[in-house]
Amino acid sequence: FLPPCAYKGTC
């Protein structure tokens, strides 16, 4: 499971 920022690539 990846945090929401990982989906948009804005971590």
Curated annotation (Swiss-Prot):
Subcellular locations according to the entry: Secreted
Keywords, ordered alphabetically: Amphibian defense peptide, Disulfide bond, Secreted
Disulfide bond annotation, renumbered to this chain: 5-11
Tissue: Expressed by the skin glands.
A biological process from GO: positive regulation of leukocyte proliferation
GO cellular component annotations of the record: extracellular region
Chief localisation class: secreted
Function field: Induces mouse splenocyte proliferation through binding to CCK-BR.
The name this protein goes by in its record: Riparin-1.2
